[in-house]
Design a protein with these regions (language model features):
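Histidine-rich, glycine-flanked metal-binding segment
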Residues: 1-45
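Residues that line or immediately flank small-molecule/substrate-binding pockets and catalytic motifs
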Residues: 12, 93, 158
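Short amphipathic alpha-helices and their capping/turn segments at secondary-structure boundaries
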Residues: 34-35, 39-42, 74-80, 139-154
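Metal-associated gating/positioning segment near the N- to mid-region
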Residues: 43-109
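Metal-coordinating catalytic core of metallo-dependent amide/deamination hydrolases
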Residues: 96-100, 105-175
């Protein structure tokens, strides 16, 4: 699509100013285009980048244990992000001993759904995979998952409740 966005307030380094923005094939260009779109009364702002999102989980499972179609959940996630001006998002997915949506099995299912949806998103959705460091028996499996799905952002976590363990408590998932 080639067009000029006219009549809007454009956010520039000095603030909002009335200006014209020209686009060609999704890229800002200097050369005016033939088609004009009047955006009088609107603002043109840059997209927001969310580098660590975990609010998307409610779209994958509307309530605890109610995991449905992960692809549909990703579509709903993207729609909410876009509606809020987020054009680039990193979805933070656990790979943990904590189970449920944080389990290695769920991480695989999530990454599979995300990979199957590749190319269908209008926003830039990537994944941050959060690995629990105490899962020593899983390092090779985790590495293979990262390579298989080309995950570019990995975080190493330690969610072991050290203080509780120090006073003799043992959380159910650690028994």
């Amino acid at each position: 699509m080639q067009c000029d966005l006219t009549g809007a307030q454009i956010l520039r380094p000095g603030g909002l100013v009335p200006d014209v923005v020209s686009l060609s094939d999704g890229v800002f260009v200097e050369t005016p285009q033939n088609r004009r779109i009047d955006l009088s009364g609107y603002w043109v702002l840059p997209g927001i980048i969310d580098l660590h999102g975990d609010g998307f989980e409610r779209h994958l499972a509307p309530r605890r244990g109610a995991v449905r179609n992960l692809g549909a959940g990703l579509v709903a996630t993207e729609a909410e992000l876009a509606a809020n001006g987020i054009t680039t998002a990193v979805l933070a997915q656990f790979y943990s001993w904590e189970g449920g949506m944080r389990s290695p099995e769920f991480a695989l299912a999530f990454l599979s759904a995300w990979s199957n949806m590749a190319g269908q998103f209008d926003t830039d959705l990537s994944v941050q995979l959060r690995f629990e460091t105490h899962m020593l028996d899983h390092y090779t499996q985790f590495y293979d998952l990262v390579r298989r799905f080309q995950v570019r952002y990995v975080v190493f976590n330690d969610h072991v409740p050290h203080q509780a363990l120090a006073v003799g408590k043992k959380p159910p998932r650690l028994t």
